[in-house]
Structure formats: structure tokens, C-alpha cells
Amino acid sequence: FIESYERLIEMSDAIDIVTPTIAHFECASKALRASKHVFIEKPITHTVNEGKKLVSLVTEAGVKAQVGHVERFNPAFLAAKEYLNQPLFIETHRLAEFNPRGTDVSVVHDLMIHDLDIILSVVKSPIKKINASGVAVVSDTADIANARIEFDNGCVANLTASRISLKNMRKSRFFQRDAYISVDFLKRKTEVVRLKNLVGEPGPLDITIDLGKNKGSKIIYFDQPKVEESNAIKMELEQFIEAIRSDKQTAVTIEEGYQALVVAHQIMDKINSSLNVLV
């Protein structure tokens, strides 16, 4: 029997923090001040200020820190990554049936933040503008929310998250030049539609589209990449351990977790300022 979590920290080399969000900073900061490696569930902290302090503590401690954005390890997303190339428009839907667990934070911090992290990891461009709206239906924080993010490179992302739906859905669609990639995180399925210039005459089974007079035609290719069977939670923890053993950068850095938190708070600021949520 271990009488306190401080004693547990003292006895450990690495700490996995899965407490309610409001306790993340307290637990993580104690572990970091004891020079322990830290794996911390999303969102990294309750407030942006706490997140900023945590980033500094990780640097000062010189240890490994990874954030539990588990969808990065979803096999459907892993299968889609090689096809993603400067998407121009992204649409995400993350819908869940109501569960009292997680209502200590808004649906933006509980669910949408998964898609925010995925999008930020793919787009890699500063954000130019955010518009958002949301409503609190059964809890004291937003239960359904929509956000539109415009990036400096021209990409636009439209995100919808709900925790009061009748069915579950976790799907993202990426539109880019001559390609469309659909990722179903729930069913673990990836579909890719690609266009290529038609050279010569099409084959008997080719599907083509005519682009108009003097613009030629394109062939439509349908791909369904193989999605490997894997356990995303196990994979993220294994990569965390490997980063410690090999002294490599963690798969989802504390800075990336902080950036997702910052954007989530910016979205909630927009929602709260719209007066659609009673706070």
C-alpha cells in the first residue's frame, strides 16, 4: 500500500497522469520537479497559463513528456498520413452519446481537441482567424460546438463536436489538390479518391471526368489503404517508453499539447463571447 501519490512519484521513473483535468497541473508539476518523465492525458492542463508553466517545467527538468492525443495513433489515420499533402479544406465530425464523465470540461476540450491536434499536426501553418459557436444543453459547459479555423496558408478547417448525439461518429475528411481522403476513426477505415491527368484514351474500366472544353480529362482512382490492426493506447505508451530509452523526441510533444490547448481556449472564448453559452 502506498500512502500518497507523492510517494508513488518518488518511487517511479515515469508517471502516467490520468486524473481529472483540473488536477493535471498539480500532479504533473510535482512529477517534473522530481525529474520524472511524464505522460499526461489531454488536455494537458485546465488553463492556458498552467499549460505554459508546464512546458517550461519540462524544459527545466530535462525529461521526456508526451501528451495523450491518442487519435494520432489510430490505425486509420496512420494509413491516411502518406496521402495527406497540403489539404485545402478539412471537415471533422466527432459526435458521442451523453456520458457524465468528461463534463468537467467543455465538449471542445473533451472531444474537439482530438481533431484540433490532428489538424494542427497536418496543416502546420499559423492560424489567421477563428469563428465558433456552441451551446450548453445538459451540462454547465458547451455540449455541442462548431468551429471554423482559417490558416495563413489558405487551408480552412470546419469542426463539429457533440456529446449529446444519438449515435457515435468520429470522421474527418481532407480535401486537397486532386485528392480526397476520408478517415473514419471509429470504424478504423480510410478511403482515398485521387485524380490524375488522362493521357491517351481511357481503358474500358476507367472512370473519367471531363474538365471542359480544351481542359482535358482526369481519371478517378479509388483506394482503400490497408489499415493495420493495432491498439492505439498501447502504441502511444510504447512510443513514450521508447523515447525515454532512446533519448528521442516524444511522438506528441508537450509543446504540441499546449498548442492544441491554446486553440481550444480560443474557440471557447469565441463561444462564450457569442453569449450562446450561459456562464
Task: Describe these PLM feature segments.
Residues 7-8, 83, 260:
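Structural alpha-helical scaffold elements that stabilize or flank donor/cofactor-binding regions
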